[in-house]
């Protein structure tokens, strides 16, 4: 650029914008723009203008035709290399590095299953344990598969690959490129992850041609000729019945998980690798082998028994597909049954640059209009503890309803959504009816176990004697039979199609039972296989999983969305059905409630948990003749002919009752399984599983206020994804909470086995229940309810908050007698509550203070002198606490005229 040009170029910044007509879109109104903004325009025009060169615009003028209605489709996606499919189990071994707070990767294991079933193990070691030397997913697959080509074990590059690991999120983060390329392609499911978009284009040629030290390769890059595969991740944990561990999977396969010999341990695999490389490799490779062999066994099972050619992501998904298939096979329209309709719409697909047809299911108007009722009536199971402490010694039985929810599904016939009607007549909710209502209720005081649930956001379900409840028809019918006064505020009845009688065993009703074909298929297939086999367990899990899918998404439960990095509401499943979910849970709660209320008057119930209860009544003495129990037994006869509706799962001689879901065995009953529910407490890792019960009993008996436990847990999916962390253990301290949860009102304190023992009664109403629960949460911060002195202190604390606090009397850490001392001094100074001027003269302020100090109260002469300044509150005393009675026993001999207003002495 010449000096002339430079000066011309600089000169333009001093000129007004109107001097540059060649700059389109600039007028005098924009003259105030910052000079730097000139650079946003065509700089070539500016430079040409500055140099005195005329520049012509050769670009064609664009018209509307230049912008087509539909953009052109993008280039055709790269095809996969071949039709060959390979299944690969993989695993990693690592040790935690406290300096980096990440894992040092020791090895990557693979176990490739060829099309003929031959297994090829392989193990790869990174150059070092440093994070920079980790293998990428592409490198791992390339180094695993290339030797197979060279050895002619495969003759072409696989077009599709499925990677299997047990608890997938423990291993996928070990790849160097996982967080940059793949983390949004995995979906969070039940604390782990699985593929939900399964195509990754991998240029394996490029990977093989690069050195190990330079493995930073764009995942979607293509070369020519390409080696491109579809890769899918499957977590085998999600396809195990009950979330079995890898060792249990190995046992089912006859392929046991190897053990680590002493002196080595799982906590220091580096030591094992250095000391016994061959043993380390055998142990590591077996885990990868079990994962893929188990998955292929499941795949074979799905193909032969379920007609599904792929390995499902979860067992719950199988349950859904089988249910819909059985409905269609039985001649019932799944849409009519579920109250849905198929809606077709056109959606733009940016990948193909074209429209695609999408079909979705939506509720029909009749269902959508009324489904708020069942959603509000969906509460889950009944969970309560009726005792606190160590029970008397006798036989205690833990009963469960046989297949509670699966059996309960049989109670559902085909609903007639178009004829739903409102009803405020309680009698309409009796019998075999699907109904949902908001009710007001009052049970007689004699009812031990009220059956209408009241939901709280913080503390779960309560069952008080009076209140308001969103209840199902079976619960309303039971409440009426117990003598409750019921007022239906708003309610609906959902009629059955082809309903003819109240007898569920009626053949016409069985034909209409929505879930009968599904339940029969599950039962028949379970019976076809040996008990405890993989197939039998799989069918059992398929049957049990369906209920959860019916209720999925009804309440505001959230799950971490790995694609967005946010906690998102758990979406409904394809069979979410509030009418079915609410009816089944209400029916099961009602059956359990009927059984407990039918027990002999002197029977003791320790607790109830969802579908069963702990009691001292033997099976032959339980009355199962009630209408709801009879109906449930009839359903059991359909599901499993000849079976009993109640099964005894545990039997012990003595129990420790702590709180809801917290019952332990104090003394065993020989030959029977023990009761062991830990209320969410996880024993330390060094405690053997066989010693868990004894550990928990000792922990409960020796607990102290503020007791804290160290808890080791794995980092959550949320924290792992947001922080791009390895799967590492997280240590935390939690406050022990084994105190009673006050879902019931404690009564009759006694001591047994050195610990406080109490029974309970239902709350009169929810206001008392919630207030006392909140106050107890305050009290237990510095106290534990272990003996009669603790009970006395709690009752005193409760009295202070209920009587003194509303009168704005300062309580703080004081107790009822401390406050009464202050009130006594005010009455003495002001000649109130039966005290006279002569009483005031009887002792000096110093003498009164000394007298009370000797009795254990913190009082000074100034307190006595100043007592006349504060007014006495307009208090009316009811019954007194033990502390107040002791104080009155101290005062009355000295001041016999002293009397509390309306006190009961």
Question: Each predicted region: which residue ranges?
Answer:
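N-terminal accessory regions of nucleic-acid-interacting proteins
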Residues: 2-88, 92
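A short acidic-Thr-Gly-centered motif at the start of a beta-strand
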Residues: 66-86, 152-157, 372-397, 597-599
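Short acidic, Gly/Ser-rich segments with clustered Asp/Glu that frequently serve as metal-coordination loops
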Residues: 92-100, 401-407
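Conserved DEDDh/DEDDy metal-dependent 3′-5′ exonuclease domain
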Residues: 118-268, 283-286
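Catalytic nucleotidyl-transfer cores of nucleotide-processing enzymes
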Residues: 173, 236, 242-243, 383-556
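Acidic, Mg2+-coordinating catalytic module of metal-dependent nucleases/exonucleases
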Residues: 239, 245-348, 592, 611
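Catalytic palm active-site di-aspartate
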Residues: 286-288, 398-403, 543, 601-617
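C-terminal, non-catalytic extensions of nucleic-acid polymerases
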Residues: 299-388, 485-598, 603-604, 615-905
């Amino acid at each position: 650029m010449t000096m002339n040009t430079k000066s011309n170029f600089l000169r333009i910044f001093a000129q007004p914008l109107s001097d540059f007509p060649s700059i389109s879109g600039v007028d005098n109104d924009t003259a105030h723009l910052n000079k730097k903004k000139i650079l946003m325009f065509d700089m070539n025009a500016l430079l040409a203008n500055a140099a005195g060169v005329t520049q012509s615009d050769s670009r064609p003028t664009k018209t509307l035709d230049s912008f087509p209605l539909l953009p052109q489709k993008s280039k055709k996606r790269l095809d996969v290399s071949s039709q060959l499919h390979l299944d690969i189990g993989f695993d990693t071994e690592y040790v935690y590095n406290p300096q980096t707070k990440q894992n040092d990767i020791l090895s990557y294991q693979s176990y490739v299953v060829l099309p003929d079933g031959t297994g090829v193990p392989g193990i790869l070691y990174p150059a070092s344990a440093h994070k920079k030397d980790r293998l990428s997913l592409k490198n791992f697959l390339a180094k695993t598969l290339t030797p197979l080509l060279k050895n002619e074990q495969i003759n072409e590059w696989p077009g599709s690959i499925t990677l299997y690991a047990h608890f997938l999120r423990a291993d996928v983060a070990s790849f160097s490129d996982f967080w940059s390329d793949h983390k949004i392609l995995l979906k969070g499911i039940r604390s782990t992850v699985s593929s939900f978009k399964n195509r990754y284009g991998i240029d394996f040629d490029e990977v093989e041609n690069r050195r190990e030290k330079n493995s930073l390769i764009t995942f979607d890059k293509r070369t020519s000729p390409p080696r491109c595969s579809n890769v899918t991740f499957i977590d085998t944990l999600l396809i195990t019945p009950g979330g079995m561990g890898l060792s249990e999977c190995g046992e089912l396969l006859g392929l046991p998980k190897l053990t680590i010999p002493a002196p080595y341990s799982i906590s220091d695999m580096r030591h094992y690798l250095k000391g016994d490389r061959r043993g380390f490799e055998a142990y590591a490779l077996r885990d990868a082998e079990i994962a893929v062999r188990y998955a292929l066994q499941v795949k074979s099972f799905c193909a032969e028994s379920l007609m599904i050619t792929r390995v499902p992501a979860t067992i719950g998904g199988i349950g859904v597909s089988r249910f819909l298939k059985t409905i269609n096979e039985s001649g019932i329209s799944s849409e009519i049954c579920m109250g849905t309709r198929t809606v077709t719409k056109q959606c733009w697909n940016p990948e193909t640059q074209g429209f695609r047809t999408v079909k979705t299911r939506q509720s029909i108007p009749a269902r959508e209009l009324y489904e708020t009722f069942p959603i509000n009536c969906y509460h889950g199971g009944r969970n309560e503890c009726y005792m606190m402490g160590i029970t008397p010694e006798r036989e205690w039985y833990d009963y469960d309803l046989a297949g509670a929810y699966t059996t309960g599904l049989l109670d559902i016939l085909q609903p007639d959504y178009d004829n739903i009607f409102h009803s405020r007549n309680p009698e309409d909710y009796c019998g075999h009816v699907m109904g949902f209502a908001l009710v007001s209720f009052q049970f007689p005081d004699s009812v031990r176990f009220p059956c209408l649930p009241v939901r709280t956001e913080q503390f779960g379900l309560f069952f008080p004697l009076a209140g308001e409840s969103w209840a199902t028809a079976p619960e309303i019918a039971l409440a009426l039979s117990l003598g409750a006064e019921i007022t239906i505020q708003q309610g609906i009845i959902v009629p059955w199609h082809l309903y003819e009688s109240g007898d569920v065993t009626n053949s016409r009703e069985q034909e209409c039972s929505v879930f009968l074909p599904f339940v029969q298929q599950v039962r028949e297939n379970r019976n076809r296989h040996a008990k405890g086999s993989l197939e039998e367990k799989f069918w059992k899990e398929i049957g049990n999983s369906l209920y959860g899918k019916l209720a999925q998404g009804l309440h505001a439960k959230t799950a971490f969305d790995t694609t967005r990095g946010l906690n998102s509401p758990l979406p409904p499943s394809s069979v979410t059905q509030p009418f079915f979910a609410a009816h089944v849970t209400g029916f099961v709660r009602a059956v359990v409630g009927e059984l407990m209320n039918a027990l002999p008057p002197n029977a003791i119930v320790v607790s109830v948990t969802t579908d069963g209860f702990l009691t001292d009544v033997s099976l032959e003495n339980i009355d199962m003749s009630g209408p709801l129990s009879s109906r449930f037994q009839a359903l059991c006869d359909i599901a499993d002919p000849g079976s009993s509706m109640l099964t005894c799962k545990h039997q012990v001689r003595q129990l420790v009752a702590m709180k809801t879901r917290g019952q332990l065995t104090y003394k065993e009953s020989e030959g029977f399984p023990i009761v062991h529910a830990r209320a969410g407490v996880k024993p330390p890792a060094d405690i053997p599983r066989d010693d868990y019960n004894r550990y928990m009993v000792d922990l409960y008996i020796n607990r102290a206020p503020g007791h804290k436990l160290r808890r080791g847990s794995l980092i959550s999916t949320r924290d792992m994804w947001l922080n791009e962390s390895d799967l590492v253990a997280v240590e935390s301290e939690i406050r022990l909470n084994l105190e009673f949860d006050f879902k019931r009102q404690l009564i009759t304190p006694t001591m047994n086995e050195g610990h406080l023992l109490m029974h309970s009664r239902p709350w009169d109403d929810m206001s008392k229940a919630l207030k006392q629960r909140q106050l107890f949460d305050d009290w237990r911060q510095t106290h534990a309810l272990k003996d009669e002195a603790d009970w006395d202190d709690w009752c005193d604390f409760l009295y202070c908050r209920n009587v003194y606090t509303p009168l704005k009397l300062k309580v703080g850490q004081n107790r009822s007698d401390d406050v009464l001392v202050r009130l006594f001094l005010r009455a003495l100074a002001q000649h109130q509550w039966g005290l006279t001027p002569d009483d005031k003269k009887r002792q000096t302020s110093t003498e009164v203070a000394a007298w009370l100090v000797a009795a254990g109260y913190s009082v000074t002469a100034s307190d006595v002198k100043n007592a006349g300044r504060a007014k006495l509150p307009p208090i009316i005393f009811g019954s007194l606490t033990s502390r107040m009675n002791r104080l009155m026993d101290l005062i009355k001999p000295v001041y016999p005229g002293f009397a509390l207003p309306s006190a009961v002495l």
